[in-house]
From Swiss-Prot:
Residues that hold ATP according to the record: G36, P37, S38, G39, C40, G41, K42, S43
Family: Belongs to the ABC transporter superfamily. sn-glycerol-3-phosphate importer (TC 3.A.1.1.3) family.
Pfam families reported in the protein's UniProt record: ABC_tran (PF00005), TOBE_2 (PF08402)
Lineage, top ranks: Bacteria, Pseudomonadati, Pseudomonadota, Alphaproteobacteria, Rhodobacterales
Alphabetic keyword roster: ATP-binding, Cell inner membrane, Cell membrane, Membrane, Nucleotide-binding, Sugar transport, Translocase, Transport
Organism: Cereibacter sphaeroides (strain ATCC 17029 / ATH 2.4.9) (Rhodobacter sphaeroides)
Top enzyme class: translocase
Residue ranges of the TM segments: none
Top-level lineage group: Bacteria
PROSITE patterns in the record: ABC_TRANSPORTER_1 (PS00211), ABC_TRANSPORTER_2 (PS50893), UGPC (PS51315)
Gene Ontology CC terms, in alphabetical order: ATP-binding cassette (ABC) transporter complex, substrate-binding subunit-containing
Coiled coil start-end: none
Domain ABC transporter: 4-234
Catalysed reaction, written as an equation: sn-glycerol 3-phosphate(out) + ATP + H2O = sn-glycerol 3-phosphate(in) + ADP + phosphate + H(+)
Protein name: sn-glycerol-3-phosphate import ATP-binding protein UgpC
Length: 349
């Protein structure tokens, strides 16, 4: 195991910078998830750590050793890819042992490592099968087993669950979490799926257009997003964003005055998560929501509607709550769960 350090890491293609000075310190044994939309630079950043992409500027160190000029095989890392990358003509046992044979480990050591990893990943009954005889989830476990047997300093996982169906993704998430709890190997995991990110990570790196917008624990990112991008990306449905105007001792939002101190004369964004809206009392300041659609999910329902000024709003309600399309509701935000952002910069106040 080892710590991983990225210092002002940059990447350019044809003179155009696509990764803009990322700084990240990953502790020994920590599980860090890099999350963001397609094209944000998360896989490029992972590939630079792996040595599959050259860095344009900055420094990457693994276990205190600068690896900028080292080949992937010299970095003591193991990668797990989205497409499994298994040898189709080899059995599960042979796939898992292949890298160890190349490293010229003894037969006894290879057998012991394969057997131990197979037990961890519940692959014992599959060791003599070929990849074509396995399900998608089983293939991904074999790919993880092949990485695990190497006892690397770090695991790098690039969207490993993307090819699996929803049920298998849940199963594999739980297995990855249990595996990390057992082996405590330093890991960087890339995904666009916020559920994977929130459930697996010790810390998250939220990427946007080559910039690490926020690096924090899942709870901190959900409760105190640093920017409107982070607030809108993490959480489903996304946080409601309401144009607002600071009045000093209050906030003007959608024609209503809320008793929320805010810089006078400043254009702001008020962020409210769907679960932090409630039915307003008769004397309570609130917004009239014209419900246009209701998504019923069983335990919960999401009412999608529009305010008088045309702003879209989503309200989370209990699944049994009698909210219907075309209803008009008076709703108010929970005062303790408001988020204020600068309208120009998008940064949290």
């Amino acid at each position: 195991m080892a710590e991983i350090s990225l210092r002002d890491v940059r990447k350019s293609y044809a003179g155009i910078e696509v990764i803009h000075g990322v700084d990240l310190e990953i502790a020994d044994g920590e599980f860090v998830v890099i999350v963001g939309p397609s094209g944000c630079g998360k896989s490029t950043l992972l590939r630079m750590v792996a040595g599959l992409e050259e860095i344009t500027a900055g420094e990457i160190a693994i276990g205190g050793r600068v690896v900028n000029r080292l080949e992937p095989r010299e970095r003591d890392i193991a990668m797990v890819f989205q497409n499994y990358a298994l040898y189709p003509h080899m059995t599960v046992r042979e796939n898992m042992a292949y890298g160890l044979r190349i490293a010229k480990l003894s037969k006894a050591e290879i057998e012991e490592r394969v057997a131990r990893s197979a037990r961890m990943l519940e692959l014992g009954q599959l060791l003599d099968r070929k990849p074509r005889q396995l399900s998608g989830g089983q293939r991904q476990r074999v790919a993880m087993g092949r990485a695990l047997v190497r006892n690397p300093a770090a695991f790098l996982l690039d969207e490993p669950l993307s090819n699996l169906d929803a049920k298998l993704r849940v199963q594999m998430r739980l297995q990855i979490k249990e595996l990390q709890r057992t082996v405590r190997t330093t890991s960087i995991y890339v995904t666009h799926d916020q559920v994977e990110a929130m459930t697996l990570a010790d810390r998250l790196v939220v990427m946007n257009a080559g910039v690490a917008e926020q690096i924090a624990t899942p709870a901190e990112i959900y409760d105190r997003p640093a920017t409107t991008f982070v607030a809108g990306f993490i959480g489903s449905p996304a946080m409601n964003m309401l144009p607002a105007r600071g009045l000093g001792d209050a906030l003007e939002v959608a024609g209503q005055r809320l008793a929320v101190p805010a810089p006078a004369g400043r254009d702001l964004i008020l962020g409210v998560r769907p679960e932090h809206l409630h039915a307003a009392g008769p004397e309570e300041p609130g917004f009239e929501l014209h419900v246009q659609a209701v998504e019923w999910l069983g335990a919960d329902a999401f009412a999608h509607g529009r305010l008088a000024d045309g702003t879209d709003l989503v309200l989370r309600t209990p699944g049994k709550a009698p909210v219907r399309e075309r209803d008009r509701l008076k709703v108010a935000p929970d005062a303790a769960a408001l988020h204020l952002f600068d309208a120009e910069t998008g940064k949290r106040l």
